[in-house]
Amino acid sequence: ASTMAGQMLNVIVDNMNNTVRAQVLEGYKEKGGTLTTDQAAKLVTPIVKNVKNMNEVGKNSANGNSPISLFQPLWIASLASAAIIFIAISKMPVSSRKENFLLKVNQIVTGAIATLVIGFGLTWIADGMVGLNISNFTDTALFLSITSFSFFLMISAVLSLVGLKGIGLFALLLFFGAPLLSLASEMLSPFYQDWVYSWLPMKFMIEGLREIFFF
């Protein structure tokens, strides 16, 4: 989006330069005046543009797409952990409501531990091994852990209702949602903004990471 805005501004300034140059030369021509070397040099670019980037993405940020780079492995890890824990829990015998309740609590606690490992592990891999620019390790790791736990709870709830068939739904969300998340919402059509992008559960992760990384 920033690249497109910069290109548009460059075209606008270039058109203004051409218009001003033509008007000034036409005025000199009507008056029969002549131009000095300095005046001619200034007429080449009568309007000088000074570009200053705000909230620059910095180095080693995947050209500003580091939130998207972190989303995909986090989503897949959350989906895999929810599926594995669900399969393990579903095979355990339950004879009473109390045992079923304790089993659900155990599922949530196990998921919380798994998502902590996912959040801190992914941040460590991205920072130490991949080399992404992560200015605040702890905030990023905690945010990813909370996000992963939220994904885990959502996926587990769906799996408890429809079974392992629900995994296909979240795979489709990854397949169709990731391309939309890489675009600025202003670049989407009103339909996608209101009925697709606003309903993507992972958009909150992308927006949160952008706040942590770039603002």
Regions found by a protein language model. Give the residues of each.
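Membrane-water interface at loop-to-transmembrane-helix junctions
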Residues: N63-F71, K98-I113, S135, L161
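Juxtamembrane loop-helix boundary motifs flanking transmembrane segments in multi-pass membrane proteins
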Residues: A41, K49, N53-V57, S96-K104, ...
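Juxtamembrane interface at the cytosolic side of transmembrane helices
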Residues: L79-F120, W124-V130
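Repeat-unit-sized solenoid/scaffold elements
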Residues: S78-S95, S145-L161
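Alpha-helical transmembrane segments of multi-pass membrane proteins, especially transporters
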Residues: P73-S78, L103, Q107, G111, ...
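Membrane-spanning alpha-helical segments of multipass transporters and channels
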Residues: W124, M129-F215
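Transport-system extracytoplasmic interface segments
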Residues: A1-I84
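A generic alpha-helix surface/boundary motif
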Residues: K31-G32, G119, F152
